[in-house]
């Protein structure tokens, strides 16, 4: 199987952490769309949003998604990548989409443990727990709609990777 694997989900679900280890375990290349975009522009996500507003960032995010999609690649996407209909169809049609889902409490704990406010601008201006709850309520249906595989991401990364590998084996054998 050489199809790209797209990891989707909200901030804090482990897309980058799991993605790097998953790519290593599958002997694949790893790319994080936010990190790729930041390296191309030499700006943080917050700086891009400040300069170009969210609409400009979303357009650049789509371009990044297209640029990094390649065979034998694990791609960690930004949490809002699914907001653009093109991106949802692109990922569904060009690879296997894995939704790393986790409850709000887990997401908030992870985000508080590794705060990166300069890299992750607020979406609502509300306190973190309220923002995570609101954003997840808005996006969960889109994550589920686009996903080929849904994985509980509350476990340790090694367990999450094991579950992804198992689900991939079943997907390939169908």
Swiss-Prot record:
User: Source taxonomy lineage?
Assistant: Bacteria, Pseudomonadati, Pseudomonadota, Gammaproteobacteria, Enterobacterales
What are the names of the required cofactors? Mg(2+)
Please write the reaction equations for the catalytic activity of this protein: shikimate + ATP = 3-phosphoshikimate + ADP + H(+)
Which cysteines form disulfides?
none
The record's listing under Pfam families reads: SKI
Q: Which organism is this entry from?
A: Escherichia coli (strain K12)
Give the GO biological process terms. Answer: amino acid biosynthetic process; aromatic amino acid family biosynthetic process; chorismate biosynthetic process
Which molecular-function annotation in GO is an example for this chain? metal ion binding
Q: What does this protein do?
A: Catalyzes the specific phosphorylation of the 3-hydroxyl group of shikimic acid using ATP as a cosubstrate.
Instruction: Return the protein name.
Output: Shikimate kinase 2
């Amino acid at each position: 199987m050489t199809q790209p694997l797209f990891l989707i989900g909200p901030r804090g679900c482990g897309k980058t952490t799991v993605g790097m280890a998953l790519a290593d375990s599958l002997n694949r290349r790893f790319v994080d769309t936010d990190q790729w975009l930041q390296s191309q522009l030499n700006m943080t996500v917050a700086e891009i949003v400040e300069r170009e507003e969210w609409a400009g960032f979303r357009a650049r995010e789509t371009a990044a998604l297209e640029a990094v999609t390649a065979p034998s690649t694990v791609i960690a996407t930004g949490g809002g990548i699914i907001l653009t209909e093109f991106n949802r169809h692109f990922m569904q049609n060009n690879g296997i989409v894995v939704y790393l889902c986790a409850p709000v409490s887990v997401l908030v704990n992870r985000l508080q443990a590794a705060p990166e406010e300069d890299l992750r601008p607020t979406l609502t201006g509300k306190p973190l727990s309220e923002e995570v709850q609101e954003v997840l309520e808005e996006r969960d249906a889109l994550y589920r709609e686009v996903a080929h595989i849904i994985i509980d991401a509350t476990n340790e990364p090694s367990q999450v990777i094991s579950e992804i590998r198992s689900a991939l084996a079943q997907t390939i054998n169908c």
